[in-house]
Amino acid sequence: MKFEKLGQSGRARRGRLTLEHGVVETPVFMPVGTYGTVKGMLPRDIEDIQAQIILGNTFHLYLRPGLEVIKQHGGLHDFIKWNKPILTDSGGFQVFSLGAMRKIKEEGVTFRSPIDGSKVFLSPEISMEIQHVLNSDIVMIFDECTPYPATHEEAQKSLQLSLRWAKRCKAHHHDELKNKNALFGIIQGGMYEDLRDESLNGLLEIGFDGYAIGGLSVGEPKEEMIKVLDYLPNKMPHDKPRYLMGVGKPEDIVEAVRRGVDMFDCVMPTRNARNGHYFVTDGLVRIRNSKYRHDQGPLDPHCDCYTCKNFTRAYLFHLEKCGEMLASMLGTIHNLRYYQRLTEGMRDALDNGTFDEFVQDFYARRGLEVPPCPVDE
């Protein structure tokens, strides 16, 4: 993996990632394809919205279809017919989500399969082996996602376990498996600055190809998330990609880019599309509102997606009211293209030296003031 920093405006960075299956321009948003498919999308649809990289999930693909099937296809790329880069989450967050169904020990995590209730064991080494079979361009370490809220003592204990697991991930990925694909560390520590420092410094000692901010978008208030983003990205290596996991709303992505983050993923655009909530240049359209019954306009006149070029809001309203699956499909195409256009717009603005104007326009269209952002002296 190679990362080049091509430009900067304040803390916002313009970069380029060269991976096994292609080049990724940053800032970038990665559509989530948990089970080897982005919900409601054909692989060609994902190409049409100009996604550069997608995300798969180790935990779910391990449980179903299982490694044997994916091995027979020579990896995840051929299995799902996607020839561009893939990042796979290690499964740590999904295990965290199981709550009482899991037991965490030094060796790893034992849990009941949400599919059939059978006992499953996942460890740093097993996570690395799964991701090796998947042949992910970017492999994430197996960690424990610190819950919110957590006391200082709980968050510290959790991050220290994650650091010990991170060491094991690196050793297995590099030394045992000889995996040439990129391996990213994940910074934990909850909402505590000293613990975020401890986690980051521990990961830097081990050494990774990129660094992710974990443990956000887990129920904390937005102000807490912004506090972490004010503080942490600028302390992360300037010559390595920075990835904010599981975030989020368009405003959150803009604010994170302003603070120096490069990579994002979130289920929000796909999940919202299935509920008739569509992101547009001026904010949000809730298509089930009866005011759209006779609306002859496109969903977003500024959008170049298949949905906006071909269908009216009235038609989308009709599909939603009838419960047609096409509503979710067209909405997903639009929402994911919106997120691609958002990050494209930021890349262009960073290339052209107009990033501040981009941010001003983004908020002005929503009738909002631009929030404050740290400025380096």
UniProtKB/Swiss-Prot annotation:
Q: Which domain of life is it from?
A: Bacteria
- A GO molecular-function descriptor: metal ion binding
Q: In which pathway does it act?
A: tRNA modification; tRNA-queuosine biosynthesis
Q: Where does Zn(2+) bind?
A: C303, C305, C308, H334
The residues annotated as the active site are D89, D265
Against PANTHER family, the record matches this protein to: QUEUINE TRNA-RIBOSYLTRANSFERASE (PTHR46499:SF1)
Q: Which family is this sequence assigned to? A: Belongs to the queuine tRNA-ribosyltransferase family.
- The protein's name is Queuine tRNA-ribosyltransferase
